Amino acid sequence: MTSRDQLVQQVLRDLQEAVESEGLEGLIGAALEAKQVLSSFTLPICQKGGPGAQVLEVDSVALSLYPEDAPRNMLPLVCKGEGSLLFEATSLLLWGHTGLSLELRARTVVEMLLHRHYYLQGMIDSKVMLQAVRYSLCSEESPEMTNLSFATLEAIFDADVKATCFPTSFSNVWHLYALASILECNIYSIYPMRNIKIRPYFNRVIMPRCSTHVTSMLHIMWAGQPLTSHLFRHQYFAPVVGLEEVEADCTASLNPVPPNLGPLLPPAKTLELLNREPGLSYSHLCDRISITKSTFYRWRRQTQEHRQKVATRFSAKHFLQDSFHRGGFVPLQQFLQRFPEISRSTYYAWKHELLGSGANSALGPATPSREALAVPEVERPPGKKAAEEVGCSSLAAAMLSPPSMILMQRAKSFLEYCISLNKLVPYRCFKCRFPGISRSTYYNWRRKALRRTPSFKLSQAAFETAESLQPTDVGKETPFSLKREAGEEETGKAGSGAPLTSRGLISPKMPLSRWQRRLRRAARKQVLNGHLPFCRFRLRYPSLLPSTFWVWKSLSRRSPGMQIPSLSQRRQKPQGRQKPEGRQKPEEQQKPEGRQKPEGRQKPVEPQAMEADQNVPAMVVPPAETLPVATSPEDVPGGPSREGNIIQEAAMTQSQPHSGSLPSQTLAEAPGGSDGQVLVMDMLTTTRFKAQAKLFLQKRFQSKTFPSYKEFQALFPLTARSTYYMWKRALYEGLTLIDG
């Protein structure tokens, strides 16, 4: 059977033969074969001693260059070999000898070849590493090295990979990154306090490619010839070990201890022993434990370093929990003054964890909630109290959820509702209403709400505070099934149109489901009154289904009290009852489409005009005569937007003209009744929208001016982001969205 060393040497010979071929194709093929061979056996467990063990000797040259900011109580050691000694130093740190340096070299070549794109572009530290490569061949920063192109760096990478196949080659920064990925441990790259301008690129902790929770770390130092007090030239790498390990090795060599054949302690027992007696040395336990010397001292050093950190984090987290139980969080600056070791991100992580997990009910006694301290109690009407005593599933779910989450839901719903009414609440007024919400959270919610409400218009009226809001669209007409929940007093105020404060809009104890029902009633009222076309309904109420609009629209047609008068009835009404800015003149309505002025074809029609020209009771979509028609969005300068044309064309295809050949009751007598009408309308509208969007993307892709998502969303706000990227990926993969 072939031994391990012979297999490694055969792999290196195959890689060296593949280097002679042009390009990297042959070398990558050899690397794939080498990976299969090397995967048949793994690296041995890190244990020192055995055949070929090297006596530890301090490197005086590297010790003179050892920086002050490096880990203390550590010494660089002498390592024998050829080249830059990177793999020899790593083998010495892990196994106490340099016998596995060739295997580390072969595994590094395979790692760098098979993950070439990751080390050049995909890694988080790729820019830092490439900048370090620029300076690795010089002692100071120079314009020539700074201006090296990416193609030159790729060529240097390929040349270094090919050179690594030979034992006498020199290593670079990316070899350290590849070694960290192979060994699955962190590597502390120690750089001398020379070459100050380029030192930050080399003196750093290098993490493996698969960055899991890695705690082990190797210390490797850049050593070489000192030129001046500020410059030095790198020549080789030196392994760095703890001072205790060197002393213990010297003591063990002078006073050898006879082996003890008793049972060895498992690693868990060794950790417990270290926690109880942190001053133990390896020489006292070398015969009783089953771990290596380097692992023992690394554990001892980590327990000494991390014991205080763990205690500090424990006390800081419990201090934050106690402050949360008392009714509020400690500000960040005050918290950092008390616990400077805790980072800002950790503070916010703990804060969101307490807000989301309801820690106030699970940890400690019952204390006043943050909602009770942040929002004052408001006396509720008797009707509302009775309704809440009856209870519902949504109210029970809201009571079971943490109070802080309920408060955040109310605050977010209140802000979204104000924006839907074209009212922009300033932060100072919002904070008076909800003092527990931060400024950043307010602006994040406001930005998202504005994105979901494209119909929002910034005007002077939009800057009114929450105290001046009048819910003219909410509560004027309460359905019979919901009158008990609303209460007589609240319904009376809303029906009379009296001004209502922000606390009346959404009471502190109102569950989220009731607020959604109120928005649904407002949308239903606007649709039944004919003041809300389909396009504006989709933009203003994205959470409601399109079929809901058509159901309400059909109900308004069937109700005799809500039916919109026809053209003949509208001509008999007095002229003063019509709004001049929202409706067309009777003369213009009576004109055929061909006699209208060309200017009227380029101006978008108001929603009231679109709704007023419907004279067929069975129709669900407005007729086509009232909509401006254009051949394409690009053909009419100054005309309506592309999205408006799409909606208008969809309405034309789904509606029936006054002079159409089909009877007016054809659609009403379709199979399935009103449900069938709704389904057909939804399918036709959605298909038309998607077809227009696909055609737009396909034309822009063919003209090599593909739009960004922001531009696409402005033209097609009803299309989801995922759908845009799905179509974009299909186009770039060579597929066709629409044939013809």
From Swiss-Prot:
Residue ranges with Basic and acidic residues bias: 578-604
Gene Ontology biological process terms in this record: regulation of transcription by RNA polymerase II
GO cellular component terms attached to this protein's record: nucleus
UniProt KW keywords: Developmental protein, DNA-binding, Nucleus, Transcription, Transcription regulation
Spans traversing the lipid bilayer: none
Main location: nucleus
GO molecular function: DNA binding
Localisation: Nucleus
Region Disordered, annotated ranges: 485-506, 560-616, 653-673
Presence of the UniProt keyword Aminoacyl-tRNA synthetase in the record: no
Biased composition (Polar residues): 653-667
Disruption phenotype: Deficient homozygous mice exhibit delayed embryonic development, impaired somite formation, failure to initate turning and lethality between 10.5 dpc and 11.5 dpc. Mice heterozygous for the allele exhibit kyphosis, decreased thoracic vertebrae numbers and missing rib.
Functional note: Acts as a transcription factor that regulates development of thoracic vertebrae.
Stored PANTHER family: VERTNIN
Similarity section: Belongs to the vertnin family.
UniProt-recorded name of the protein: Vertnin
Organism whose genome encodes this protein: Mus musculus (Mouse)
